[in-house]
C-alpha cells in the first residue's frame, strides 16, 4: 500500500507530462464503478434512427447505413461528482516545475483512453509539446501484435515468400499530404519489427477535426497505432499503394496505445456495438439525459470513449466512477442498397477493379493480371477470389470484398462486411422480412382475411352497372364470369378514372398497371366455355370499383381477394382513455406508458436494490414513421365533382398539433402516415335527361360492307344514381343512330396466278389447267371463304382438242458398238409405233405396239456387224476366294489361277507358260475372321514321375486371348486339368537274375532320370529297379 501511495504522490508531483508508470497505474488500476443490483444491466431505450448516410459508391450499387444509440433512461441516477484536485484551483502557470528529460518519457503526451475519457493536460502546457515520438512510446506501441494482412494485402492465404512487393518498385513523387499514406509503396515484405529506428521518423496521422463544441481540440501530435484489421487497396480508379504501416484510413480520431479493457467493460456481450461512458462534468439533470448518451458521430473514438467537454476540470480524476451501459434489444444499425447513377459502360465491375488492384503485387515471384473468379458457393461469394488471366488457378486475396459488391452477377444479394445479405421487403439488407399472403411486410398472415362470393343478380338496364367495391390493400384478386356472355367487366379507380373497358370502349386482353399493381385481363374464346376474368397479385394502394357492361342477363360473377384486417386493440379496464383519439395516420404507434414514481434515496448514498422503470420520455410520441409533432385530421371535403346527379368529393386533411390543436405545416406530420384522399360519393339536383347508347353489335358480315346495331335508352341522373326514363323526355334531343354501316376489312377476290398448261394429249381431246387463288386486300393468299361472298371463281380446268391422231413407225439410230469384239456380231436399234408423236406402248386402249401400224412395213431392229477376224489371246483366269482358314483372328484365303486362251467366243485352258508374259494375280491373301474369344491352351504331358505303383504327369495350362497374350477371362469350368495319374501297375519287389544292366551308361540314365521310359527300364533294369526301391522308401 505504501508503495502504491508513493507512486501516486510521484504522479501528482510531476503533473505534466504524465509519466508512463502513472499512466499504466491509472489505466490498469481497479475500476470504481457504480454497483448495480446483482450485476444486472439496466434496460435502455432506443433513440431515433439517424439519417441514412450517403451512398458508399458514386455510381452503380452501393450501401447506405443508418444507426441508432441505446440511451440511458432519464430516471437513471447519476454518480456524485468527485471533488476537484486542489491543484486545479491554483492559477495557471504556478506550481509547475521543470521536468528532467528521461529516456522512457517524452514531452509529447498522446491521448490515452481511460475510464474517464481522454486525459487532458493543463492549458498552459498546450502547444509546447514536441512532435517527435520518443523511443519509449515506440516500444510501447510494438506491444500490439502484427497480424497477417495488416499491410494492405490479403490475410488468407498469406505467406511472405509468396506475397511481396516488386523488387524495383516505382517511387512516385512526394505526396502532398504525408499523413494520408498515399503514394507510398513498401520496398520490402512486411515484418513484425517496426522500421522507425532504421528508416527515419514515422508518418504521423492527421489530427481529426472536432465536429462538436464539446470535443477538445489539441494541437499535439498523435501516437501512431497499427490498424487492427487489414484494409484492402482502394478500388476506385488506380489502386492506391499502402505504406508499411497499413492503410492510412485507419487513423480516425485520437488513437492512443492499446489498453486492456477494465473489468467493467462497456462492450456488449456479443460485441455488436460499443457503449460510451458518460463524461463527469457537473451539468444539469436535463442536459445529462441528452449528453451522456450521444449517437456516434463520424469522428468518434475507436474504442467508444467520449472526450471531456470544455467545462470539465483541467486535471483528470484517477478514480472516475462509471455507470453500466444500458442494454437494448434489437439492431443498432441498418443497411440498404443504393444506386446514385449507373456506372459508365466502359468501367469494369467492382470485382474486376478490386482484383486489378493486386496487379502490382508479386505472387510466387511474378506479376499477374487478375480477374474475378466467381465459380464459388456459400460464404466464399463475398471473398475476393481472383484468377490470373491465362492460368487455371485462383487465389483468395482478401476475406471480404468491398461493401456493395454483388454476391453473384445478376443477383440482388449484396456483400456487406463479408456477408451476403438479401434485401427484405422493407428494403433493409439482412432484415429477412417478407410480405405475407395479404401483402403486409414482415407479417405472419394472422391478419389476412379471405373475402369471396358470387354475384348472381340478373342485373339492371344496359350499360355500366357497379357490381363490386374492393378496398385498398387487397391482394390476390380474382374476378371472373361463370360462363361466356356478351357482357364485359370494367374497372374504375379513384375519381371514376377508367382502368379497363372505360369510356364505352372495349380494351384488348393484356396487362394493365394501376393503383400499385398489375391487372391481367383475360377474354378466352367462347368455345372454351369460360367467361372473361380479371386478376392481380396486389396489394392495391387505392380502392377500386368493378363494373359490368350489361348487354344481356348476368351469367354470374365470382370474386375473391385477401385483405389485412387490423388486430383488435385490448384496453386495460384501469387505464383511462386518452382525450385525443389516435388518428389513422398513427400506424401502430407505441402507447404511452404511465410514469412510475422515482425511488427516493438519502443524499450522499448509492442507490442499491432498485430496478429502473422502463418509462419513455413523456414528451415524445412514437409512431411507425418516427417522431412527429402533429397528426393528420380531416377538416372537410372539396366541392362535389358533379353539378347535378351523383358525383364525388375528396376529404381534406390538415396537420394538427398534438398539444395545442392548432394547424401546423405539413412537414410537422409524417408524410407516409397521411391518409389517402379517397373519393366519397356526393349528390346534387337531377341532371337533364340524355340519350345513352349501348355497345355496337358485331358487324353483320365478316368482310365487305355490313351493318351494326345498338340499343338506345333515355336516361336521367338523380341523386341516388342514373335510371332509365320514358323516351319522350329525350324527344327534344337529337336521336342518335341505332344502325351504322361497318366493314371489318375488304373481302378477297379471285386471281389467276398462272397461264394454261399444255394439253394432256398430243392428238385428240384432252384437258388443260391453271392456278386460281383467293387473294386478300394486301395481296396475300387467304382462305377461299373470304371470296365466297364475291363473284364465282374463274375456271381452273378446261377441255382441249389437239386434232385427229395418225400412226407411223419410228426408229432410233443403230447402236455404236458391235456385240462381238472380233468376227461377226449384231447391232441394235429401237423401233416403236407412235400416234402423232405419242407412243402406244403401255396404253391399255391402244393394245400392242404393232396395233395401228402395218407389220410388213416395220423397219428391222437389228443387223450384222464385223470388226475383223479374231486372233488368239491368252489371259489369266482367277477363281473365287476360298473361306478364311481361321474361324477367328487372322487367317489366309486362296484361289485357283489358270491360263486361258481365247479365240473369238471360244475359251480353252492352256499351259501357264503361255501367260508368263502377263502379271500373275496373287493366289493367297490374308483374311480376318471373327474376334477370337479367350481360350485355354495346354502343353504336352510330362513323363510319368514313377515307372510303377502310380505316378503323376503334369502339364502347363494358360489362358490366352485372341492375340496370343495372357488373359484372365477364360471360363474357369472349362479349364483343363494340370495333373493326371500314370503307371499304376505294381512294381517287382526284388530284381531277378534276368534283371541286369545291358548298357554301360546306366548310371547316366539314372542321373538323367530316364527310368520312366520303358526302353531304359529294360536296358538298365537293375539300376532302375534300385532307384525304384529308394523311391518307395521315401514319402510321396
Swiss-Prot record:
Widely expressed in a range of tissues. Especially prevalent in brain, spinal cord, muscle, lung and heart. Residues 1-24 form the signal peptide. Residues 215-253 have a biased composition (Polar residues). The keyword Secreted applies. Residues 163-173 have a biased composition (Basic residues). GO terms for cellular component: extracellular matrix; extracellular region; interstitial matrix. Glycans are attached at residues 454, 737. Keywords: Apoptosis, Extracellular matrix, Glycoprotein, Repeat, Secreted, Signal. PANTHER family: ADAMTS A DISINTEGRIN AND METALLOPROTEASE WITH THROMBOSPONDIN MOTIFS PROTEASE (PTHR13723), ADAMTS-LIKE PROTEIN 4 (PTHR13723:SF144). Positive regulation of apoptosis. May facilitate FBN1 microfibril biogenesis. This is ADAMTS-like protein 4. It comes from Mus musculus (Mouse). The lineage of its organism: Eukaryota, Metazoa, Chordata, Craniata, Vertebrata.
Amino acid at each position: 500500500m505504501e508503495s502504491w501511495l508513493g507512486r501516486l504522490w510521484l504522479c501528482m508531483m510531476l503533473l505534466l507530462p504524465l509519466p508512463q508508470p502513472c499512466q499504466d497505474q491509472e489505466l490498469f488500476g481497479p475500476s470504481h464503478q457504480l454497483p448495480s443490483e446483482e450485476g444486472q444491466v439496466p434496460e435502455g431505450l432506443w433513440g431515433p434512427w439517424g439519417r441514412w448516410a450517403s451512398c458508399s459508391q458514386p455510381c452503380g450499387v452501393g450501401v447506405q447505413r443508418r444507426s441508432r444509440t441505446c440511451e440511458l433512461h432519464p430516471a437513471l441516477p447519476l454518480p456524485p461528482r468527485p471533488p476537484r484536485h486542489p491543484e486545479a484551483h491554483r492559477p495557471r502557470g504556478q506550481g509547475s516545475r521543470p521536468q528532467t528529460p528521461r529516456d522512457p518519457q517524452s514531452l509529447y503526451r498522446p491521448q490515452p483512453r481511460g475510464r474517464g475519457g481522454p486525459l487532458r493536460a493543463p492549458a498552459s502546457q498546450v502547444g509546447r509539446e514536441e512532435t517527435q515520438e520518443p523511443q519509449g512510446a515506440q516500444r510501447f506501441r510494438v506491444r500490439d501484435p502484427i497480424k497477417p494482412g495488416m499491410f494492405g494485402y490479403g490475410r488468407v492465404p498469406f505467406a511472405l515468400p509468396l506475397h511481396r512487393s516488386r523488387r524495383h518498385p516505382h517511387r512516385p513523387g512526394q505526396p502532398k499530404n504525408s499523413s494520408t499514406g498515399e503514394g507510398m509503396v513498401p520496398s520490402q515484405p512486411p515484418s513484425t519489427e517496426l522500421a522507425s529506428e532504421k528508416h527515419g521518423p514515422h508518418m504521423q496521422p492527421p489530427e481529426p477535426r472536432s465536429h462538436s463544441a464539446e470535443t477538445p481540440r489539441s494541437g499535439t501530435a498523435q501516437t501512431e497505432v497499427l490498424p487492427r484489421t487489414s484494409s484492402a487497396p482502394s478500388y476506385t480508379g488506380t489502386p492506391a499503394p499502402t505504406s508499411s504501416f497499413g492503410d492510412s484510413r485507419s487513423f480516425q480520431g485520437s488513437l492512443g496505445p492499446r489498453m486492456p479493457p477494465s473489468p467493467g467493460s462497456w462492450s456488449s456481450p456479443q460485441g455488436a456495438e460499443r457503449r460510451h461512458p458518460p463524461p463527469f462534468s457537473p451539468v444539469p439533470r436535463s442536459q445529462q439525459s441528452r449528453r451522456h448518451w450521444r449517437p456516434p458521430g463520424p469522428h468518434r473514438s475507436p474504442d467508444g470513449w467520449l472526450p471531456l467537454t470544455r467545462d470539465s476540470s483541467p486535471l483528470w480524476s484517477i478514480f472516475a466512477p462509471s455507470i453500466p451501459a444500458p442494454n437494448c434489444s434489437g439492431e443498432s444499425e441498418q443497411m440498404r442498397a443504393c444506386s446514385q447513377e449507373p456506372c459508365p459502360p466502359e468501367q469494369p465491375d467492382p470485382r474486376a477493379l478490386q482484383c486489378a488492384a493486386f496487379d502490382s503485387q508479386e505472387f510466387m515471384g511474378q506479376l499477374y493480371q487478375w480477374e474475378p473468379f466467381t465459380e464459388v458457393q456459400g460464404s466464399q461469394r463475398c471473398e475476393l477470389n481472383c484468377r490470373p488471366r491465362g492460368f487455371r488457378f485462383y487465389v483468395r486475396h482478401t476475406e471480404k470484398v468491398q461493401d456493395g459488391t454483388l454476391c453473384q452477377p445478376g443477383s440482388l444479394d449484396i456483400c456487406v462486411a463479408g456477408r451476403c445479405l438479401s434485401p427484405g421487403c422493407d428494403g433493409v439488407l439482412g432484415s429477412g422480412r417478407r410480405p405475407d399472403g395479404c401483402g403486409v411486410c414482415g407479417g405472419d398472415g394472422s391478419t389476412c382475411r379471405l373475402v369471396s362470393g358470387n354475384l348472381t343478380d340478373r342485373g339492371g338496364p344496359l350499360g355500366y352497372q357497379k357490381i363490386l367495391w374492393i378496398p385498398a390493400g387487397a391482394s390476390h384478386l380474382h374476378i371472373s364470369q361463370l360462363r361466356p356472355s356478351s357482357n364485359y367487366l370494367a374497372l374504375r379507380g379513384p375519381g371514376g378514372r377508367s382502368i379497363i373497358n372505360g369510356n364505352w370502349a372495349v380494351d384488348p386482353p393484356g396487362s394493365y398497371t394501376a393503383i400499385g399493381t398489375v391487372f391481367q385481363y383475360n377474354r378466352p374464346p367462347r368455345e372454351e366455355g369460360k367467361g372473361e376474368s380479371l386478376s392481380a397479385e396486389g396489394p392495391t394502394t387505392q380502392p377500386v370499383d368493378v363494373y359490368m357492361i350489361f348487354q344481356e342477363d348476368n351469367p354470374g360473377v365470382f370474386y375473391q381477394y385477401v385483405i389485412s384486417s387490423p388486430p383488435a386493440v385490448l384496453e386495460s379496464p384501469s387505464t383511462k382513455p386518452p382525450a385525443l383519439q389516435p388518428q389513422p395516420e398513427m400506424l401502430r404507434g407505441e402507447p404511452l406508458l404511465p410514469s412510475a414514481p422515482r425511488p427516493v434515496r438519502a443524499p450522499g448514498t448509492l442507490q442499491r436494490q432498485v430496478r429502473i422503470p422502463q418509462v419513455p420520455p413523456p414528451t415524445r410520441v412514437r409512431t411507425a414513421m418516427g417522431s412527429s409533432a402533429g397528426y393528420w385530421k380531416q377538416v372537410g371535403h372539396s366541392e362535389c365533382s358533379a353539378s347535378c346527379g351523383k358525383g364525388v368529393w375528396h376529404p381534406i386533411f390538415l396537420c394538427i398539433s398534438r398539444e395545442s390543436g392548432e394547424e401546423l405545416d405539413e412537414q410537422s406530420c409524417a408524410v407516409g402516415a397521411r391518409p389517402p384522399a379517397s373519393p366519397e360519393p356526393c349528390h346534387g339536383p337531377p341532371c337533364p335527361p340524355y340519350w345513352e347508347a349501348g355497345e355496337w353489335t358485331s358487324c353483320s358480315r365478316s368482310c365487305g360492307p355490313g351493318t351494326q346495331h345498338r340499343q338506345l335508352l333515355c336516361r336521367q341522373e338523380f341523386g341516388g344514381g342514373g335510371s332509365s326514363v320514358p323516351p319522350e323526355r329525350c324527344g327534344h334531343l337529337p336521336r342518335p343512330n341505332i344502325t351504322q354501316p361497318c366493314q371489318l376489312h375488304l373481302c378477297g377476290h379471285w386471281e389467276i396466278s398462272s397461264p394454261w398448261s399444255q394439253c394432256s394429249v398430243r392428238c385428240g381431246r384432252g384437258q388443260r389447267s391453271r392456278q386460281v387463288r383467293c387473294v386478300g386486300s394486301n395481296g396475300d393468299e387467304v382462305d377461299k371463304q373470304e371470296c365466297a361472298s364475291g363473284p364465282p371463281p374463274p375456271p381452273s380446268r378446261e377441255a382441249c382438242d389437239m386434232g385427229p391422231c395418225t400412226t407411223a413407225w419410228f426408229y432410233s439410230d443403230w447402236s455404236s458398238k458391235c456385240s462381238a469384239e472380233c468376227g461377226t456380231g449384231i447391232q441394235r436399234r429401237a423401233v416403236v409405233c407412235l400416234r402423232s408423236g405419242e407412243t402406244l406402248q403401255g396404253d391399255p386402249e391402244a393394245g400392242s405396239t404393232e396395233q395401228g401400224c402395218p407389220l410388213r412395213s416395220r423397219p428391222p431392229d437389228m443387223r450384222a456387224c464385223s470388226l475383223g477376224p479374231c486372233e488368239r489371246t491368252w489371259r489369266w483366269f482367277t477363281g473365287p476366294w476360298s473361306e478364311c482358314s481361321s474361324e477367328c483372328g487372322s487367317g489366309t484365303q486362296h484361289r485357283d489361277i489358270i491360263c486361258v486362251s481365247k479365240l473369238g467366243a471360244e475359251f480353252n485352258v492352256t499351259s501357264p507358260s503361255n501367260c508368263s508374259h502377263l502379271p500373275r494375280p496373287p493366289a493367297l491373301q490374308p483374311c480376318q475372321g471373327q474376334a477370337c474369344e479367350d481360350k485355354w491352351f495346354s502343353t504336352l504331358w510330362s513323363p510319368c514321375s514313377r515307372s510303377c505303383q502310380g505316378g503323376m504327369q503334369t502339364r502347363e495350362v494358360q489362358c490366352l486371348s485372341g492375340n496370343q497374350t495372357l488373359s484372365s477371362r477364360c471360363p474357369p469350368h472349362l479349364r483343363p486339368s494340370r495333373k493326371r495319374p500314370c503307371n499304376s501297375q505294381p512294381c517287382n519287389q526284388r530284381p531277378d537274375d534276368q534283371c541286369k544292366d545291358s548298357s554301360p551308361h546306366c548310371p547316366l540314365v539314372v542321373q538323367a532320370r530316364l527310368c520312366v521310359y520303358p526302353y531304359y527300364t529294360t536296358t538298365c533294369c537293375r539300376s532302375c529297379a534300385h532307384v525304384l526301391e529308394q523311391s518307395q522308401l521315401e514319402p510321396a
